[in-house]
């Protein structure tokens, strides 16, 4: 047992030799400090102030598999007693880095990569992603051409009774809606301020499938479509059609029609103002007129808001919401599909 202990304590043992080399490096470092003590309070070389060490040690392997201790130089960067040493990067990391450089150069040569004025370099493989997308769209259109033709030829009122068409409009219409309509009406079709909800039965221009189809085709107040749905609420305040007192009166009357808190005296005075200026579109009882896109003022649905300040702004400034006409932007089959999808959301009549 004694021989075994001596063997482990021998300098010939690799682990023990490494430890001895570490100790020797530490002794050498301590000797450097004693030979050149840093300046500080008290001038005590054995207890100098905290200063960056000039170096550290680490164990490295040589090509023959042996290990040795080497000194690692410091970069000179130190903060709060923490030093940065100039250790070399791991070999695996370096080779990975070099491999990515080679891969990047090969990709630059093989694929479109360098932008030009009217395009980009095509690369040795001649890859063209735009052509790939166009081919995929063409393949999709060819695959769906039969059912799209059937959809266009089928009367609108018969689409829901055909399982194949009903399934197609539910899926294709939803995809079209998310792409072109959700930006205003919301991904769930719940609408937002100034953009009507498509989930309820409150429709400005009508909620039958035929009426929805017409609205999608021609839009609302789209100057580029001659058949667009059009109506315009006067700017009663900006154009001086009503005085501020009259606007306050008619606003309170509108609040009264909607069952909202209001000033009874002003509302009574606003009845005549409403009859003279608003009833031609909204009807004398405030229930609106779909032929003109005039909303019902007696229900709980408010496109822009139901607070007095918002209603005052609407009467004074006059809203002018616009929906684009989708004829020419979407195919006839796509328009039918999205109209049928909107009609099926729950509020269709």
UniProtKB/Swiss-Prot annotation:
GO terms for cellular component: plasma membrane. The chain crosses the membrane at residues 97-117. Residues 118-349 are periplasmic. Residues 168-258, 265-346 form the Cytochrome c domain. Keywords: Cell inner membrane, Cell membrane, Electron transport, Heme, Hydrogen ion transport, Ion transport, Iron, Membrane, Metal-binding, Oxidoreductase, Repeat, Respiratory chain, Transmembrane, Transmembrane helix, Transport. Heme c 1 binds at residues 181, 184-185, 323. Heme c 2 binds at residues 233, 278, 281-282. Its cofactor is heme c. It is found in: Cell inner membrane. The keyword Acetylation does not apply. Residues 1-67 are annotated as: Disordered. Component of the cbb3-type cytochrome c oxidase at least composed of CcoN, CcoO, CcoQ and CcoP. C-type cytochrome. Part of the cbb3-type cytochrome c oxidase complex. CcoP subunit is required for transferring electrons from donor cytochrome c via its heme groups to CcoO subunit. From there, electrons are shuttled to the catalytic binuclear center of CcoN subunit where oxygen reduction takes place. The complex also functions as a proton pump. Belongs to the CcoP / FixP family. This is Cbb3-type cytochrome c oxidase subunit CcoP. The gene is ccoP.
């Amino acid at each position: 047992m004694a021989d075994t202990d001596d063997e482990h304590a021998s300098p010939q043992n690799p682990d023990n030799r490494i430890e001895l080399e570490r100790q020797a490096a530490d002794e050498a470092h301590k000797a450097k400090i004693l030979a050149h003590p840093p300046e500080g309070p008290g001038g005590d070389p054995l207890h100098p102030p905290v200063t960056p060490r000039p170096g550290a040690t680490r164990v490295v392997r040589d090509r023959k598999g042996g290990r040795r201790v080497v000194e690692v130089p410091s970069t000179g960067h130190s903060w709060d007693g923490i030093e940065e040493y100039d250790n070399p990067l791991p070999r695996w990391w370096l080779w990975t880095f070099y491999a990515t450089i080679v891969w990047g150069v090969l990709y630059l040569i093989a694929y479109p990569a360098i932008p030009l004025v009217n395009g980009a370099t095509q690369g040795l493989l001649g890859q063209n992603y735009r052509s790939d997308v166009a081919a995929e769209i063409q393949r999709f259109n060819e695959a769906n051409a039969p059912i799209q033709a059937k959809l266009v030829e089928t009367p609108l009122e018969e689409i829901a009774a055909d399982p194949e068409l009903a399934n197609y409009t539910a899926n294709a219409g939803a995809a079209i809606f998310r792409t072109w309509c959700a930006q205003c009406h919301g991904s769930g079709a719940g609408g937002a301020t100034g953009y009507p909800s498509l989930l309820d039965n409150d429709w400005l221009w009508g909620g039958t499938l035929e009426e929805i189809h017409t609205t999608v085709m021609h839009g609302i107040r789209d100057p580029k479509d001659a058949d667009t749905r059009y109506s315009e609420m006067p700017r009663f305040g900006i154009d001086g059609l009503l005085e501020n007192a009259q606007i306050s009166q008619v606003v309170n009357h509108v609040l009264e029609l909607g069952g909202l808190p209001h000033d009874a005296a002003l509302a009574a005075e606003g009845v005549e103002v409403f009859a003279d200026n608003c009833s031609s579109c909204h009807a004398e009882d405030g229930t609106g007129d779909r032929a003109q896109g005039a909303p019902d003022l007696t229900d709980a649905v408010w496109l822009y808001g139901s607070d007095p300040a918002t209603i005052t702004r609407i009467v004074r400034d006059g809203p002018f919401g616009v929906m684009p006409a989708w004829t020419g932007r979407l195919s006839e089959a796509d328009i039918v599909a999205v109209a049928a999808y909107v009609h099926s959301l729950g509020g269709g009549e």
